[in-house]
A protein has these predicted regions:
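Outer-membrane beta-barrel "beta-signal"
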Residues: 172-185
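Transmembrane beta-strands of outer-membrane beta-barrel proteins
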Residues: 15-23, 60-62, 101-107, 157-159
Length: 185
């Protein structure tokens, strides 16, 4: 049984760690009618404080890079970086803790299109384009954590980043699956 002082704690615990992810981006948001359809890979992390026995919030940040091969030269890519404040609800059942939540924040899409040339030389490329587009990020996610020990958890998470800019929904978009480790107290 928890003592009255422990029950009144504002912060019930904290957790944080790193995750790698893989997914798929599709769609096009460019004047060249390039339909981006590519696997994407990345890394990121989170740090959260547990405010109740079932609710936690904090900060997180990730980046994800998708190589583009259709309609452009090798070396072209679409990169997403986003950071924000995650809020999720979790339910601890023995060693397993499923969770559901969303992150609200912002980010930047960087698109690099190489139309002619070679990425392996040191020559200036005349037909290349680099564009950066800031966006508002809303990232719903679901996941599950498994306690390996007292302080170490493995996490598996899936999300679908929705990035909005002044014209509406930013494309490309798509799902991602994360695998990582979380240290918790």
């Amino acid at each position: 049984m928890l003592s009255l002082a422990e029950n009144r704690k504002t912060i019930k615990g904290f957790s944080g760690g790193m995750m790698v992810h893989s997914g798929y981006q599709y769609g096009g948001d460019n004047p060249f009618n390039l339909n981006i359809s590519s696997p994407t890979f990345g890394i990121g992390g989170c740090a959260k404080i547990h405010l109740t026995d079932h609710f936690r919030t904090g900060m997180e940040g990730f980046f994800s890079t998708a190589p583009i091969r259709k309609g452009v030269q090798s070396g072209s890519y679409n990169k997403l970086f986003w950071t924000g404040i995650p809020c999720d609800w979790f339910w601890q059942k023995g060693k397993v803790a499923p969770y559901i939540g969303a992150t609200l924040g912002g980010g930047m899409e960087t698109a690099f299109y190489l139309f002619e040339g070679d990425k392996h030389d040191w020559e200036p490329e005349v037909k290349a384009l680099l564009r950066k587009q800031p966006f508002l990020a809303f990232d719903p996610y679901v996941g599950i954590e498994y306690a390996v020990g007292k302080a170490l958890r493995l996490t598996l998470r899936a999300d679908w980043l929705l990035a909005f800019h002044k014209e509406g929904l930013n494309m490309p978009t798509g799902p991602r699956v994360y695998l990582g480790f979380i240290f918790a107290h």
